[in-house]
Amino acid sequence: MKFNVIVVCLLLNCAVAVAQPAGVALDTITVRHVDFQGQTQQGVLICNKTRAKDLREIFDELYKAKYPIERVRPISEYGDDDERSMRANNTSCYCYRPIAGSKKLSKHAQGLAIDINPLYNPCVRRQKDGTLLIQPATGKPYADRKKPFKYKITSRDLCYRLFIEHGFRWGGSWRTLKDYQHFEK
């Protein structure tokens, strides 16, 4: 696969080099969000240009509703390490990587997917030996969706409703695995 290397200048006084698959148009957008302390923050998402308008509209509605999102930073600030970003409960879109346990590229590799508050909304997969693989590993306390806890995305949640209204699919409704943090379109 061919790559173009682009430099994305962020509004937060930093520059990030991003390996971008040839033919994929990425955009850098700034979104306001309310953090877990109730403070307004400026977040940065690198996403596919075809998703930028939807994401701006969704984040605007989440912000107006004071929906808590701990942090929104490019994955490059975590050394392009998805697990590290998820452990920090970082909401992000673009990450050039395959689907976990596969050679097939993730929707994140094209900026077509977003993970919201991933620590509290882990990806849960039952392995062939019957054990659960939970990502991030530190999200284990939040894998049991029957337990009550803050920041949990459910089908009754505002975040869920907004993404669905914009035509996204939720990983929490998948059959083979449950990726509660994940929305893609």
Set out the residue ranges of the language-model regions.
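Boundary at the C-terminal end of the N-terminal hydrophobic targeting segment
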Residues: A17-A19
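Active-site acidic/histidine clusters and adjacent loop/turn architecture
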Residues: G23-M86
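Catalytic cores and adjacent binding grooves of peptidoglycan-active enzymes
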Residues: I99-G101, I114-K185
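Stable alpha-helical elements in mature extracytoplasmic
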Residues: R51-I58, L112, S155-C159
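Extracellular/periplasmic catalytic domains that process cell-envelope and extracellular macromolecules
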Residues: A22-A25, L105-G111, I164
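Mid-length scaffold segments of soluble, non-membrane domains
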Residues: R84-L119
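Bacterial N-terminal signal peptides
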Residues: V5-C14
